[in-house]
Amino acid sequence: MDTFQVIILALIQGLTEFLPISSSAHLILPAQLLGWEDQGLSFDVAVNTGSLFAVVIYFRHELWAMFKAWIASIVKGQHSDDSKLAWWIILATLPAVFFGFMAKDFIATHLRNTGVIAVTTVVFGLLLWWADKMSRHDLTIYQTGWRKALLIGFAQALALIPGTSRSGATMTAALMLGLSRDAAARFSFLMSVPVSLGAAILVGKDLAESPLPIDYQALTLGTVISFAAAYLCIHYFLKIISRMGMTPFVIYRLALGAVLCGFIFL
């Protein structure tokens, strides 16, 4: 890949990973418009790692508090709001792990195409709008509970379907269950840590066994750009939804779905 392609794809990954607008839909557009080939496994690992670093550093205080409380709940039997939240995040991760393992080959073979992504981009955009308008928005992140956490986890598993958007599906479910916009977004971001870490380990294992050459300069640049874009995205997204809700992202999803449909039918 040339430098321009690295910059564009890393920006797309960083900006769309945590917005409810589907990163897979956006990665299709440059390929369609510019005729780019697949960026390769090593680059996927690099930009995903950059996004993971961004969410870990942004929420470092919350994650550290959760980790200490989680250890205390195991070792000393001391339970607190942070330890409960940590257990809920772990519980919410399980459905995606199970269904990802069981269905990854089917999804890669049958669902990773422009038609599916166009439909899911529109349908789940409408669901996000409905959830944002109908939700009570009165529960904090510490009022999630294990039942709601598990349901949000199943929504994350549903996001294995390309175009759905992991953050979009989890935020939609959280809003439907009564969480505030800020709580829904923060729970979704925290959920991304174990999922992204697990995916990075698995894909990294495949990469280590691959005989293909690695362009370390491109990977380093992609990681740095993805990190910076994702960090800024998280910061400003939390500000936007507190003032405007999810409507701007719903409108964007509908427009993006229309563009993708144009590639199919025109």
UniProtKB/Swiss-Prot annotation:
Could you tell me one molecular function GO term of this UniProt entry? undecaprenyl-diphosphatase activity
Record has Amino-acid biosynthesis as a keyword? no
Tell me a GO cellular component. plasma membrane
Entry's localization field: Cell inner membrane
State the membrane topology.
Multi-pass membrane protein
Which Gene Ontology BP annotations are present?
cell wall organization; peptidoglycan biosynthetic process; peptidoglycan metabolic process; regulation of cell shape; response to antibiotic
Chief location of this protein within or outside the cell:
membrane
Q: Where are the transmembrane segments?
A: 1-21, 39-59, 87-107, 114-134, 149-169, 183-203, 218-238, 246-266
InterPro entries from the xrefs? UppP
Which cysteine pairs make disulfide bonds? none
Keyword Calcium assigned: no
Record-listed E.C. numbers: 3.6.1.27
Q: Which UniProt keywords apply?
A: Antibiotic resistance, Cell inner membrane, Cell membrane, Cell shape, Cell wall biogenesis/degradation, Hydrolase, Membrane, Peptidoglycan synthesis, Transmembrane, Transmembrane helix
Superkingdom per UniProt: Bacteria
Which reaction(s) are listed as its catalytic activity? di-trans,octa-cis-undecaprenyl diphosphate + H2O = di-trans,octa-cis-undecaprenyl phosphate + phosphate + H(+)
This molecule's function is given as:
Catalyzes the dephosphorylation of undecaprenyl diphosphate (UPP). Confers resistance to bacitracin.
Do you know which PANTHER family this protein is assigned to? UNDECAPRENYL-DIPHOSPHATASE
| Miscellaneous comment in the UniProt entry for this protein | Bacitracin is thought to be involved in the inhibition of peptidoglycan synthesis by sequestering undecaprenyl diphosphate, thereby reducing the pool of lipid carrier available.
User: Which family would the database say this protein is a member of?
Assistant: Belongs to the UppP family.
- The protein's name is Undecaprenyl-diphosphatase 1
Instruction: Tell me the name of the encoding gene.
Output: uppP1
